[in-house]
Amino acid sequence: MKKDTLLLIILILFCIVHVYGIYVHIYGINVSLENVSQYLYNTTVYLSYENGTPCFYIGEKKEFVIIPPYIKVDRDIAPLIKKLRFKIENKSYNLIITKKNVNTNKMAIIFTSINGSREVNGNKTIIWIKDPLKLKQSEVEALYELPEKGEVIARYKDGKPAAIKINNKIYVGFKPDEDVLANLIYIHIVKKTSNPLPYILFTVFLTLASLMLTFQETLKKKFLELISALASVKVFILSRINLLDEEKVLLNDTRREIYNYILDNPGCHLRELSKNLNKPVSTLTWHLRILEKANLIKSKKFGNRLIYYPADMDMRDLPLLYLKNETQKSIFEYLLKSPAHLRKIAKDLNLNVETVRYNLKKLENLGIVKSKEEGNRIVYYINESILKFHK
């Protein structure tokens, strides 16, 4: 009897170990099962069309096919996605876009179109339109001068921008009847599940069945292969962040409004949020803390202010996003190269001395620029604490 009890305890312990391994692997915790070598997150996903239907797959040999490609989208771009014959279902999948590679033999994902470009003072000015297919009506969204550091992501063969990153968003150029440029955007699909319990119970069943049948090396090896395969298929359920927690955090209307504002205005500070969202500082502080704990946003001391930005944003973009004034941006970029005195800055940037003086004072008040006396001149330089954003 004692022997049977001991055996049962051993079986339960084996089961718990295997279940825990699957569980942590599913939720992207930095622990992996033994013998698992294929991961489906942080991997290039390819797009092809089979019988007119878009199909995502992992790897050039299509080892892992993800179908049907349900995509969660905003209302503004839903008509564009439907034009490409994608199915839209908010309950099934998220589509995460970042700056990497995607290979496709047809036009892939459209977010916002580049209507055209022209030469202006040696810089290319991009005119953005929100509705390139004229499903409602086209409108100019913004004018943006290039080049800017890290903004152009890809170009078409004719040299025109194919994809551009601005304010932490990626805008893809729309070119009807032409193949989209390879190496455009990086996509990975994260499948959501409302409850991991069925997978855990299924794993418990497999573990018990396998261990009860035999402890022979051959069957143990097959069992591990099965668990590994199961883990590698399920690993894209949640990648790094528990999307269920993220969903719960953003179910709150106020929190979602704050989060969306930060997405659109990275580098904003508390008083700006309070003014533009018409909410008290105490309320904002509470919700901002929750968003940070959920790893949806981050905060950083920038000059004299604490600023907020999306968690996945490149910190090197923050200073230029924070400085809304183009003159201040020019002065900031100039001083990044080397310290200088007032008249040299004005001369090299072809700006009025008083204009430069006024904006330098603003930058000093923000704690972004500092000054020191060198001989009979005052030299301006970037605050050391700001320089870490550009390392």
From Swiss-Prot:
Swiss-Prot/TrEMBL keywords: DNA-binding, Transcription, Transcription regulation
Coiled coil segments of this chain: none
Gene3D superfamilies listed in its UniProt record: Winged helix-like DNA-binding domain superfamily/Winged helix DNA-binding domain
Pfam families in the cross-refs: HTH_24, HTH_5
GO molecular function: DNA binding; DNA-binding transcription factor activity
Family annotation (InterPro entries): ArsR-like_HTH, HTH_ArsR_DNA-bd_dom, WH-like_DNA-bd_sf, WH_DNA-bd_sf
Ranges of residues in domain HTH arsR-type: 235-330
Cross-referenced CDD domains: HTH_ARSR (cd00090)
SUPFAM superfamilies named among the record's database cross-references: Winged helix' DNA-binding domain (SSF46785)
Official protein name in the record: Uncharacterized HTH-type transcriptional regulator MJ1398
Organism of provenance: Methanocaldococcus jannaschii (strain ATCC 43067 / DSM 2661 / JAL-1 / JCM 10045 / NBRC 100440)
Source lineage: Archaea, Methanobacteriati, Methanobacteriota, Methanomada group, Methanococci
